[in-house]
């Protein structure tokens, strides 16, 4: 499968400081790719550069063979790149259904809107069973499902997920990652950042280890789970230190 997203030698940061120091990463269409690494390594910054929230200082971001460095976040959204931030983005006082409708605010074609709403509800039945309840009354895992459903209304090609399981209990985390796999069943592509590396890699086709602003290792999610060094540093046995880099 050809890559849908190619990040080449990307340097990015705020002011004089660089968070990303030459990131190279390719993401194949129709797959889930998980970025793991220590806090401050630049994982969320990668998502921001792809979504347009942060312009890279050097290097390129290409989506479907088109360089998108100069495109605004809205222009990238229209191309099919949707960023779901770490913070919950639902309106708690609004109903689940009204939150879902917010995903189609740019659509003027009511027939198309209904079609996308139907697809979202089919993928995430909670949007039907809890439609009239306030979003704020749902659990964290349920709210995340509604966020993902709302993303489908935008008909994305590439979905950027920042810490989708943060604050969730193990059962809710499992449901959310199953939902993420559902997104790819229809040919969509997911690039996610996940601090819970074990859960993220288990749900992903590919994984990438980011350290000190550089991608150190790219492999299948399954092989990274079995890698003793990755397990020691990121799967609960120890914390990485500067003198313990992950090596290919």
Across the structure, where does each feature detected by a protein language model lie?
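Catalytic Walker B motif of ABC-type/P-loop ATPase nucleotide-binding domains
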Residues: 159-163
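Conserved ABC ATPase signature
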Residues: 134-138, 142
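Conserved ABC transporter NBD signature motif
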Residues: 59-67, 79, 113-117, 219
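Conserved catalytic motifs of ABC-family nucleotide-binding domains
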Residues: 155
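Helix-to-loop junction immediately C-terminal to a conserved catalytic motif
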Residues: 51
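The feature captures the beta-strand-to-loop junction immediately N-terminal to the Walker
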Residues: 36-38
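ABC ATPase C-loop
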Residues: 151-152
